[in-house]
Amino acid sequence: MFEITYKGLFIFITLAWIATRAICGIKNKKVDWKYEAKLLTVYICLVVIARIVYFPMRLVEGHIASLVLDIEKIFPLWINLIPIVHLFDVYDGWLINIIGNVTMFIPVGLAWPFCFKKLDTLGKTVLVGAGFPLFIETTQLPFYDRCSDIDDIILNTTGIFIGALIYFGVKLLKNRKNRIS
């Protein structure tokens, strides 16, 4: 059995981020601090989403519960591949689950096209963005107390779509205003 704490995952994500940004700086032989500041929005999205997705909101003895990897309990995988079947099942917190899964990813839809020039259309942003929840759902598979659900991917991608729609809508309005002026 192996336990991953939020603090451990936070340190891992942070060190990986710093190493990646340092390698990019060395490769490019310069650091664009304005761009690095923009990229912090992506980093914040990663850290916050990792906290919400991998670590339950309930506290155990006053601390964030650990993520437990137990090889003997991996199978059977907890996975739902049939969309919408369980989405509207009424249980405590079902509405919060739906709203939370959408709103949690709106910042991704805003941050990614803001930071990455190649994500210059709504379609590209949503298509690339959909890979992020797919990655998250896949990485939850080995953890017996987590489940992977196609509905989460659909809801998360909807959040990315909403965020990108806001981003490109504001950008369009700004461009129109500049043309009129």
Description of each model-found segment:
Residues 1-145, 150, 164-181:
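Bulky hydrophobic segments
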